[in-house]
Regions:
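Structural signature of tandem-repeat unit edges
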Residues: 33-41, 59-67, 87-119, 130-143, ...
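Boundary at the C-terminal end of the N-terminal hydrophobic targeting segment
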Residues: 22-27
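Bacterial N-terminal signal peptides that target proteins for export
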Residues: 1-11
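A generic local structural motif
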Residues: 2, 47-49, 221, 230
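Bacterial N-terminal signal peptides
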Residues: 9-20
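A structural signal for leucine-rich repeat
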Residues: 75-82, 109-114, 217-219
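Short, T/G/N/S-enriched strand-turn elements that build extracellular solenoid repeat scaffolds
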Residues: 44-54, 71-80, 216
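Consensus positions within tandem repeat domains that build extended binding/scaffold surfaces
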Residues: 122-125, 145-150, 168-173, 191-196, ...
Length: 232
C-alpha cells in the first residue's frame, strides 16, 4: 500500500511539472522557441515541410539542403514579410542557413521579379525583415545583391561565408542593430551605400593581410558606402 501511495505521489508530481511546462508554453503565445531543423531533399519543398499553421510560430529555424525562390518566399513570410512586402505574423528571429545552398529555380519570392540564382543572396532577400536578429548564411554564396538586408534593423548577429566576393549597393542599409561585422578575405568589391544607416556599427574586421589599392578594380571603399556609419 505504501509503495502504491509513493507511486501515486510521484505521478501526481510529474503531472504538476508537465502542467507547469504547458502553462509556460501557453504564456509564450504558443511560439516554438527551440530550434527546428528542416532537411530538404529537393528545392522548392519547404512549403510542404512547414505548414501554414506553424510558420508564424517558429522563432528559430535551421534549413539543410537546396533552397530556391519558392522556399525563399516562405522564409520571408516566416521572418515577417509577405510576397508584396507587407507585414505578416511571422516571428522567425534566428535563421541558420550554413548548411543550405541557394539554387536557381522556383517562383519569385518578392513581387514578380525577384528570383534566386545559384550561390547568390538575391536582391531584397530579407528586405524589411526587422524581426530577424541572428543569421548564418550559406557557406557557398559568392555575392550579396542590392538591398538584401535593407531595413533589417533588428539584426545583431550575421555570419558571412568565406566564399563571399562581392557586396552590392545598399546591401546592409538601415541595419542599425549591427555593432560589428567580419568581412572575409576573398571580398573584392563593396557597392555604394552598402552600409548606409548602420548607426550602431562600431567595428569592421577584414581578414586579409593587404587590401588592394583604391581604383584597382578589385576593392574600393568610398565615403558614401559607409554613410551613417558613425564610428568610421
Amino acid at each position: 500500500m505504501r509503495n502504491f501511495t509513493f507511486k501515486g505521489l510521484f505521478l501526481a508530481a510529474m503531472f504538476m511539472v508537465l502542467g507547469s511546462l504547458a502553462i509556460q508554453a501557453a504564456d509564450n503565445d504558443g511560439l516554438i522557441t527551440k530550434q527546428i531543423i528542416v532537411k530538404l531533399e529537393k528545392a522548392g519543398t519547404l512549403p510542404d515541410r512547414i505548414g501554414s499553421t506553424k510558420r508564424n510560430k517558429i522563432t528559430n529555424l535551421k534549413i539543410i539542403g537546396e533552397i530556391n525562390g519558392t522556399d525563399w518566399r516562405v522564409i520571408r513570410e516566416m521572418a515577417g514579410r509577405s510576397y508584396y512586402n507587407d507585414g505578416t505574423d511571422g516571428k522567425l528571429a534566428i535563421l541558420d542557413l550554413s548548411e543550405a545552398k541557394i539554387v536557381s529555380g522556383g517562383g519569385s519570392y518578392l513581387y514578380d521579379d525577384s528570383y534566386t540564382n545559384d550561390n547568390e543572396l538575391g536582391s531584397c532577400a530579407f528586405l524589411n525583415c526587422s524581426g530577424l536578429t541572428s543569421l548564418s548564411l550559406p557557406s557557398g554564396i559568392t555575392s550579396i545583391d542590392w538591398n538584401a538586408f535593407s531595413g533589417c534593423s533588428g539584426l545583431t548577429s550575421l555570419t558571412l561565408p568565406s566564399s563571399l566576393t562581392s557586396i552590392d549597393s545598399g546591401a546592409f542599409s538601415g541595419c542599425s542593430g549591427l555593432t560589428s561585422l567580419s568581412l572575409p578575405s576573398g571580398l573584392t568589391s563593396i557597392g555604394d551605400g552598402a552600409f548606409r544607416g548602420c548607426s550602431g556599427l562600431t567595428s569592421i574586421y577584414v581578414y586579409t593581410e593587404k587590401l588592394p589599392n583604391m581604383g584597382s578594380g578589385k576593392f574600393s571603399i568610398e565615403v558614401q558606402k559607409f554613410e551613417g556609419f558613425q564610428a568610421l
